[in-house]
Regions:
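Class I S-adenosyl-L-methionine-dependent methyltransferase catalytic core
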Residues: 1-155
Length: 155
């Protein structure tokens, strides 16, 4: 999961980069929904949360219901299959895959090749220091917060 230190740093960058209020957000590998709730609380108009773990999706659905937050839409799906079939554009796509996942480099590649970002949209992939995405299409910058790295992509 994204540390509080890294999350604070990320949202500080986003505050100066993209308008979260009114944004359509896709949260990939959402887990318990930490980032989902953060985007929702900052004014996103919709947050689609994807994870293949049923318990995570059930938790996000239950929490969103308790918070009476109907902009959060949790969906149990394999992230890569979802990206292969998605035809919706998003203003912000955030991915927090397991650091040991070998397919991390494929996330931004699929987002960019499938043209899933809206105009001026932003894709952020969280990863460890061992993963280098700087040669990928659309790469803009890398930000490091301790052991957490964020790679930013746009059209």
């Amino acid at each position: 999961p994204t540390t509080d230190f890294a999350k604070e740093g990320l949202f500080n960058i986003l505050r100066h980069t993209i308008e979260i209020e009114g944004a359509a957000v896709l949260d990939l590998f959402c887990g318990t929904g930490n980032m989902t709730y953060e985007f929702a609380s900052r004014g996103a108009v919709s947050v689609l949360s994807i994870d293949r773990n049923f318990n995570c999706i059930r938790f996000v659905r239950k929490s969103a219901g308790e918070l009476k937050c109907d902009i959060i839409k949790p969906l149990k799906f394999d992230v890569f299959k979802f990206l292969d079939n998605c035809e919706i554009k998003f203003d912000i796509i955030f991915a927090d895959p397991p650091y040991e996942l070998n397919e991390i480099p494929h996330i931004a590649k699929k987002v960019m090749s499938r043209n899933l970002l809206s105009e001026n949209g932003l894709c952020i992939v969280e990863h460890s220091k061992k993963t280098d995405l700087s040669e990928d299409v659309g790469f803009q910058k890398l930000k490091n917060y301790g052991n957490v790295n964020f790679s930013f992509f746009s059209e």
